[in-house]
Amino acid sequence: MDSRTGEPITARQAMNGEYIWRVPNPLYFKIIKHHKRPFNYNHDIIQVRIQFNHNLRRALAIHKCFLDFTVFTRLQPATWRFLRVFKTQVMKYLDSLGVISINNVIRSVDHVLYNVLDSTFDVIEDHDIKFNFY
């Protein structure tokens, strides 16, 4: 849903893409929180944010795009190592597709968390997307 207007994102907006080789460094990756074994649970909670950079947002007619993923995993990775592996694998998957769009980024995250990394048992996705009016 577009957080500015409250209207649902159309399939055309979600699939609108740009060739990955035309946009240098298209995504920013950040770890927002990393809870290590909270409340003596047997899993870690890692919150990752993916931001679209300026050139990609301009190509896709997006004002703002933050994709937040809360990952519940039984792994006990160091924060920097998880971010490095996650970023590398997401970019490798997007390179193999050749086109970067909102749907392809979400599809690549799903592939990395469930097929590449072991012991991921739940992911909660949240987003803040605003499209340009003009």
Curated annotation (Swiss-Prot):
The keyword Membrane does not apply. Keywords: Host-virus interaction. GO terms for biological process: viral process. InterPro entries: Gemini_AL3 (IPR000657). It comes from the Viruses. The keyword Transmembrane helix does not apply. Homooligomer. Interacts with the replication-associated protein (REP). Interacts with host proliferating cell nuclear antigen (PCNA). Interacts with host retinoblastoma-related protein 1 (RBR1), and may thereby deregulate the host cell cycle. Oligomerization and interaction with PCNA are necessary for optimal replication enhancement. Belongs to the geminiviridae replication enhancer protein family. Increases viral DNA accumulation. Enhances infectivity and symptom expression. This is Replication enhancer protein. It comes from Tomato leaf curl virus (strain Australia) (ToLCV).
